[in-house]
Regions:
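N-terminal Rossmann-like NAD(P)+-binding subdomain of aldehyde/semialdehyde dehydrogenases
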Residues: 1-51
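Residue-level signal for inorganic ion chemistry
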Residues: 7, 30, 87, 119, ...
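Hydrophobic packing residues within well-ordered alpha-helices of enzyme cores
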Residues: 30, 102-105, 133, 154, ...
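Conserved small-residue-rich beta-alpha loop and adjacent elements
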Residues: 43-115
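A structured beta-alpha segment of the ubiquitous adenosine-cofactor-binding alpha/beta core
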Residues: 52-53, 120-143
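Generic hydrophobic/aromatic pocket-lining and core-packing "Φ" positions
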Residues: 80-81, 130, 151, 187
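Short beta->alpha connector loops at strand-helix junctions that form conserved
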Residues: 88, 93-95, 123, 145, ...
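ALDH superfamily catalytic-core signature
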Residues: 141, 149-187
């Protein structure tokens, strides 16, 4: 309830949307990745009777996560839960417009037993806090959701260190309208 209230106050969304869409999604995301954590296994492939090929999945290390403002709780969970399941620590920069929900999620994770220092929140503006995360040599991967412009900047800035980078950029919502479509009803 506190988390939904914080989200509504930060985003201006109705409490019902914060509760059902965002908080419901957060709960489902953490539940899913809690189960997934037990299924991250390496593989063994028999090449021939004298040769095996083994893979071992290991955490990537420290993940820098930069979040947008539009779905702050849900998108925070989409970054935090998989990183926890994979055994990674993280430095998270929430949007400067909606930092409180992410801070509250981190607090709840700590109360649930996640050790201190696993989830680290770095509030601030992107040009300062985000840039510090991207340029930090001890951060092994960057996960960013936001604009294409900033995504390009992150990709360039991280190329010197060859960090792994995941970008979710500038969502699109295309529509296909056929000749017989009533355009007025589509608007």
């Amino acid at each position: 309830e506190t988390l939904a209230k914080i989200n509504s106050e930060e985003t201006g969304k109705p409490i019902r949307e914060s509760s059902i869409v965002e908080l419901g999604g957060v709960i489902r995301t953490f539940d899913y990745y809690a189960g997934a954590a037990t299924k991250i296994l390496g593989n063994t492939q028999v090449i021939n009777e004298n040769l095996l090929s083994l893979t071992l999945k290991e955490p990537v290390g420290v993940v820098g996560q930069i979040l947008p403002w539009n779905f702050p709780l849900l998108l925070a969970s989409w970054k935090i839960a998989p990183a926890l399941a994979a055994g990674c620590t993280m430095v998270i920069k929430p949007s400067e417009l909606t930092p409180l929900g992410t801070l509250e999620i981190a607090k709840l994770c700590e109360e649930a037993g996640v050790p201190n220092g696993v989830i680290n929140i770095c509030p601030g503006v992107g040009e300062v806090a985000g840039a510090a995360i991207v340029q930090n040599p001890y951060i092994n991967k960057i996960s960013f959701t936001g604009s294409t412009k900033v995504g390009k900047q992150i990709l360039k800035a991280s190329s010197d260190t060859l960090k792994k980078v995941s970008l979710e950029l500038g969502g699109k919502a295309p529509n296909i309208l056929f000749e017989d479509c009533d355009i007025d009803s589509c608007l």
